[in-house]
Structure formats: structure tokens, C-alpha cells
Curated annotation (Swiss-Prot):
Annotated InterPro entries: CASP_dom (IPR006702), CASPL-5 (IPR045009)
Membrane topology note: Multi-pass membrane protein
Protein name: CASP-like protein 5A2
Glycosylation (residues): N62
Gene Ontology annotations for the cellular component aspect, listed alphabetically: plasma membrane
Residues that span the membrane, as ranges: 37-57, 69-89, 104-124, 154-174
S-S bonds: none
Subunit architecture: Homodimer and heterodimers.
Organism, scientific name: Ginkgo biloba (Ginkgo)
Residue spans, topological domain Cytoplasmic: 1-36, 90-103, 175-177
Amino acid sequence: MNASHPAVHPVGVPPAVAGQLPPRMRMKEIQGMPGTIGGLLLRLGQFCFALVAFSIMVSIENFSTVTAFCYLVAATVLQCLWSLALAIIDGYALLVKRSLRNSLLVSLLVVGDGVTATLTFAAACASAGITVLIGNDLRQCKENHCARYETATALAFLSWFMVSLSFILTFWLLATR
């Protein structure tokens, strides 16, 4: 008899039953998703851009007289807190080699990224509108700090772009589960 017996020749994977699909392979981790180095870099970029935008806006003495600029400050503070917390989680996951593929956690990340992206984008757009009004329409850049307003607004847009990338990648991860 030429048949192999499991006790003599162990088989690592049981043979496929007729009509049964082979087990699905997990796709390799795409950089930028939670728990990857790319994801950590995106979170750190979001944090840095939002922090610098916040710092520039707060350094202007009369920013609080314009509601859109106050909104930008509030949105960048929220973005800083969210991005820093998730950068710490990503860094910890990388250090202990844990996957952040839990569907409840991924759902929370999608909602949080979506909310912070929307708030940051709205604040950056409002600030850009006021900056254009002050600089181009009213031509009052001599009395105001147009260059600093523009820089803070541009950095808020960069932070929004990076959180949007995180949102898209995390949403894709959630949708392909």
C-alpha cells in the first residue's frame, strides 16, 4: 500500500473538500493604514501641520476678533489632540507588533478621521475666505497680518489633506473587511 498516513507523514494543512473555497489570504498591509509606519507618519504630519497652524494663529494678537480664525484655532486644537493620540496608538502597535484590524477600532478611526477632516476643512475654508476678503477685497494687509493668516490657513489645508488620506485608507480597510 503506497498511501501516506498522518501519523507517519503529518500534513500541515488539511486537504480541501470538494466545493470548498481555499482560505482567503490577508492582503499585505498598505502603508498609511493604522498600525503601519506610513500611518504613523501621516498622524505625525497631521499633528505637526495643525500645531504650527495653531501656533501661528495664536501668535497674532487680534485673531480672536474674527470668528473664522477662532474656529480655525478650535479645529486645529481638536486635530492636534486626535492626531497625537492616534500617533501614540500607532507607535505602540508598531513597538509591540500588534495589528489594529479590530473592526470596532477601525470604525471608531473612520468616524473620528471623518469628523476631524470635515471640521479642519471647514475651518481652513472659512479662514481662507476671510484672508481673501482682508487682503484682496478690502486691501487692509498693512494693518493686518495677511501673510501669517495665509500661512496658518495653508498649513490647516495641509493637515486636512493628510487626515483625508488617513480617512480614505481607513475607510477602505473597513469596507474590505
